Regions:
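Soluble N-terminal interaction domains of secretory/endomembrane membrane proteins
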Residues: 1-133, 168-172
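Alpha-helical heptad-repeat coiled-coil segments that mediate oligomerization/polymerization in large
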Residues: 116, 127-130, 134-141, 148-151, ...
Length: 172
C-alpha cells in the first residue's frame, strides 16, 4: 500500500502537487514526476466521469472531479478504493492542507478496516489450527477408548479362562 502522488487542479490547471518518489533513484525522480503530472492532466482533460480508476500493472490512477476542483491520486494497486475515496473527501473539505493529508494517507495504518481484516484472518488461521489439533486429539482419544475397551474385554476373557483352569485343578 503506497501513495505516490496527489495533484490538485482547478479548471484543468495544476495548482498543487505532492509526491513521494522515494522508491525511485535520484536520476529517475524528475522524469517520473513530470510523467505523473502529464499523465494525470491528460486523463483529467479527457475524462467525462466524475470518479474513475485506471489500473496499469502496479499503478492505479484515480481521477476525482468536483464542481470547483479536480484531484488526481496515484497509488499502487494494493491501495484500497475506500481509502482513496476517504482521501478525496478530505481533500474536498480542506485541500489547502495537502502536506498533512498526504502524510496521513501515506501511512499504512490509516487503513483501520484493512488492519482489522488482517488481524481477523490471522485469528481465523490460529482458530482453524487449534480446531484441527483438537479434532486430532479427539481421534486419538477415540483410539485410546477403543484400545481400553479391547483391553477390558481381553482381561475379562483372561480372567474367565484362568478361573476355569483353576477350578479343574485341586490343591492338595
Amino acid at each position: 500500500m503506497f501513495l505516490y502522488c496527489i495533484n490538485i487542479y482547478k479548471n484543468n490547471i495544476l495548482l498543487e502537487s505532492k509526491k513521494n518518489l522515494s522508491r525511485y533513484g535520484f536520476f529517475q525522480k524528475n522524469t517520473i514526476s513530470e510523467f505523473m503530472d502529464f499523465f494525470s492532466t491528460t486523463l483529467l482533460i479527457k475524462s467525462t466521469d466524475n470518479i474513475f480508476n485506471i489500473v496499469e500493472k502496479e499503478y492505479k490512477v484515480t481521477i476525482c472531479k468536483d464542481i470547483e476542483y479536480s484531484y488526481s491520486i496515484i497509488t499502487d494497486t494494493e491501495y484500497p478504493d475506500r481509502i482513496i475515496y476517504n482521501l478525496h473527501n478530505e481533500l474536498n473539505k480542506n485541500h489547502s492542507e495537502l502536506e498533512i493529508i498526504f502524510n496521513k494517507y501515506s501511512d499504512a495504518e490509516i487503513d483501520k478496516i484493512g488492519t482489522i481484516n488482517k488481524e481477523l484472518k490471522e485469528t481465523k488461521e490460529i482458530l482453524n489450527k487449534t480446531i484441527e489439533s483438537l479434532l486430532q486429539r479427539g481421534e486419538t482419544l477415540d483410539k485410546l477408548i477403543e484400545q481400553t475397551e479391547d483391553l477390558t474385554k481381553s482381561s475379562k476373557l483372561f480372567y474367565k479362562n484362568a478361573k476355569k483352569m483353576n477350578s479343574c485343578c485341586v490343591i492338595i
